[in-house]
């Protein structure tokens, strides 16, 4: 996008803010606009203005709402929920580790999806080392490709890493992923993933729950 268009959007936002009229939808759309145009710092400021009353300030290197207690935004730095045939993704208030909900997905055995069940853009600092952790619980997850956590550079190259996929039936297993942010990278995409299988028996069935996701800078 041209600089003139970015400046015009900024002036329009400032005018709207002065009038005291921005809605939550306005905040989220403008936050998305700033992220898309490479202004993660500005987007973070807008995001924190939106959530200032909830005392839930987001800082670089932190996952937003790792216990799934906030409404899903599908925009900004919030959770973005995926879609694919044969997959139902929802917040589960019955099976959880902490808080009100876990993220759950049910696979009906009809498809072989390559899907991010949920993902979010996380602002980070280049050259810094971080650890992502979370808990995954499964029930009768089939195929050789199960559920894993993944990080990759957002609008930058040189970073893609993931945990080992979890299959079968298991109680809550802690997953940990360490990574260093490459030069020039201002944000990552963190995802809860299932990759498509290349096996003949590749149609996945079963259920999965994910909860208590965290990200912290390492010394």
What is the predicted function of each stretch?
Residues 1-219:
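Extracellular and organelle-lumenal recognition/adhesion modules and their flexible linkers in secreted
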